[in-house]
């Protein structure tokens, strides 16, 4: 079978500098898509709607579910939410899109560029979680079926690194709504066919003008 892995579209920023403390929602950050992200999600319809998709799966996070929604409507499929597809920092109180990380958190950006997850992440546990999620989806689609999975850069990268025997989990730059394909054989073989197809969305990948940086010392958790 074929797994079509899609990174979510561009979400909004959630940062301490964006609103007074009294106006900030409590709990983990779970941002919706930006208008640009909504357009990116619509582009997935043209990229994938003609394929024989038998199942559509998504992370529980809003940015992934919103990305999957237009494709689900075009395919006439109800997305299946898989909790183990959530990103490694799903419980963080802040979310900063990756193109703003060099300004807002240079140390985290350099760690990501080095291919490393944050020090706070149990890499082994995260790898096992996402691998189990993907293998469960594979098991549900035997033969020559195709399933689409909308998730996150860390989730997709970590599984690819495991499949390819790489020693660092964040190896591939994955753009918003970039498409990666993995072929899964009944004999257990997994073949990475393509990584980060972006022809459908190339003109929407130039980062928007960054918002003003917060005051020095007001740190935020940044995410892919």
Where are these regions (language model features)?
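An N-terminal RHG(E/S)-centered segment typical of histidine phosphatases
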Residues: 1-54, 69, 73-77, 94-95, ...
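Phosphate-handling substructures
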Residues: 31-32, 74-132, 193-194, 205
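Glycine-rich phosphate-binding loop signature in dinucleotide/nucleotide-binding domains
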Residues: 49-52, 137-145
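Short glycine-rich phosphate-binding loop at a beta-alpha junction
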Residues: 52-60, 146-150
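Active-site signature of alpha/beta-hydrolase-fold catalytic machinery across serine-
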Residues: 70, 158-162
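GST superfamily/GST-like fold recognition
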Residues: 153-157, 185, 191
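Domain-level recognition of soluble alpha/beta enzyme cores
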Residues: 167-189
């Amino acid at each position: 079978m074929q797994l079509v892995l899609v990174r979510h579209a561009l979400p909004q920023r959630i940062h301490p500098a964006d609103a007074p403390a009294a106006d900030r929602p409590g709990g983990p950050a779970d941002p919706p898509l930006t208008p640009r992200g909504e357009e990116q999600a619509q582009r997935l319809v043209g990229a994938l709607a003609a394929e024989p998709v038998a199942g559509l799966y998504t992370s529980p996070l809003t940015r992934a579910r919103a990305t999957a929604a237009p494709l689900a409507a075009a395919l006439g499929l109800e997305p299946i939410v898989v909790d183990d597809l959530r990103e490694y920092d799903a419980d963080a109180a802040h979310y900063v899109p990756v193109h703003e990380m060099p300004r807002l958190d240079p140390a985290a950006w350099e760690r990501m560029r080095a291919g490393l997850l944050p020090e706070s992440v149990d890499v082994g546990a995260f790898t096992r979680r996402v691998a189990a999620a993907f293998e469960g989806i594979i098991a549900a689609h035997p033969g020559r079926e195709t399933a689409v999975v909308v998730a996150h850069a860390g989730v997709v990268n970590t599984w690819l690194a495991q499949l390819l025997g790489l020693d660092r989990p964040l190896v591939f730059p994955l753009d918003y709504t970039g498409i990666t394909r993995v072929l899964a054989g009944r004999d257990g073989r997994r073949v990475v066919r393509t990584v980060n197809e972006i022809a459908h969305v190339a003109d929407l990948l130039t980062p928007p003008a960054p918002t003003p940086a917060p005051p020095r010392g007001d740190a935020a958790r940044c995410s892919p």
